[in-house]
């Protein structure tokens, strides 16, 4: 029994080469509203960050302002990608103390941060690759995000596309690393195995993978852990690990109340989609039975959005 509770995903921070440009894309194409900012104007001399929000989803898009920083090295090595997956907790100090006592490596100890809107407590630990988890306790904070960020007063309001919350966050591992990472989440956080598949379940003639989904107690947090399996061609998981130069977040899945409307809106905003083979839809009814949606509408490309790392998946 943990001495703290993880309530939900708090936010994901992406390290990107141009935070301002990325923020523009997330607003104009994905419907995220910029709500907070941190940079030179707020006293941050090493990094600039834009906080983007749509319903319950928050992304922090950050870029370095000076050379030779850990953030700059991360971008040089991995390209644009997810650095931190943060959890909203009821007690940061207990979360940090318990996870580090169980073997997690600390990045930063619990720290009280405050401004005129109140106070929050944050702490960070390492997970696989160069990825981290930050515990965020904001029980006594009334601002839009966290102390140190100023509210963004923007003239142009984003047009939401129907994204509601983060459904799951997927981490890709080198071959043989999936089980140790899952053991880490079970030991450090007390999470349980929610679902699993092997190469017999997720495979094609050319590529395959193994996956275990780890979840917290209330199952608001789901983190599939993938590793490559042998196929006639290189697994997409292995391709990611080689391109990213190690383990990391492959994609962030976000829920939509009406995925058809969401996808249509995204396409009208200029988001590109990878095509789904027509053969998938030709056998769909035989595989899953009758359903209400118009198959002619479904057969339009609706799978993964074609973005820079990490890919975004709609569910």
Where are the predicted features?
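An N-terminus-focused feature that recognizes amino-terminal "leader" regions
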Residues: 1-128, 136-139, 146-150
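Beta-propeller domains
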Residues: 171-222, 226
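Acyltransferase donor/substrate-recognition loop-hinge adjacent to the catalytic core
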Residues: 129, 133-172, 192, 217-224, ...
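Conserved small/polar residues in nucleotide/adenosyl-binding loops
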Residues: 305-311
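Conserved active-site tyrosine of GNAT-family acetyltransferases
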Residues: 22-27, 99, 185-186, 266, ...
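N-terminal beta-strand motif that seeds the catalytic metal site of vicinal oxygen chelate
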Residues: 1-20, 82-85, 142-182, 245-255
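A cross-kingdom feature marking solvent-exposed beta-strand/loop segments within repeated
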Residues: 37-47, 65-84, 102, 106-121, ...
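Acidic/polar loop patches that form or flank catalytic/metal-binding clefts of enzymes
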Residues: 35, 179-181, 193-197, 222-223, ...
